Design a protein with these regions (language model features):
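Cysteine-nucleophile active-site neighborhood
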Residues: 1-62
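Amide-donor transfer/coupling interface in amidating biosynthetic enzymes
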Residues: 45-134
Length: 134
């Protein structure tokens, strides 16, 4: 974990998906551990249940400049959830990028992105393209 922790502390871009969101969170609702603690949020592990609770959705994803000001919207982005977490509480330093079924499922804090869904298993690369420019 140390090379990743050094990368985060250096202010370099980081993108955590699913378990990556858990690792980046400052607080976990149902886990006493804190891993990197870089994202001002409380995350609930396995919030969507077991493998059979996996699902897909399509939502708009807001994007932000590193200073937190709005950058734009990625419209109609496919979301694939596999036993994913969700954000139980967003801290003042993080920005909500996306909600699905009434739950926050993507956050941005400066150059840190975290999603409860798996953008890497869809052919849509727009969120990765955004990550490359923050």
């Amino acid at each position: 974990f140390e090379p990743i922790n050094e990368h985060i502390k250096a202010g370099k871009p980081v993108f955590g998906t699913c378990a990556g969101m858990i690792l980046l969170a400052q607080r976990l609702e149902n886990d006493p551990n804190v891993y990197f603690g870089a994202l001002d949020a409380t995350v609930r592990r396995n919030a969507y249940g077991r493998q059979l609770g996996s699902f897909m959705a399509t939502e708009n994803v807001a994007t932000f400049h590193a200073d937190g000001t709005p950058a734009g919207v990625i419209e109609n982005f496919p979301l694939v959830f596999i036993r994913g977490p969700f954000v139980a509480e967003t801290g003042a330093n993080a920005r909500v990028m996306c909600e699905a079924n009434g739950n926050t499922v993507a956050l941005q804090q400066g150059r840190i992105l975290a999603t409860a869904f798996h953008p890497e298993i869809t052919p849509d690369t727009r969120i990765h393209e955004f990550f490359l420019i923050i």
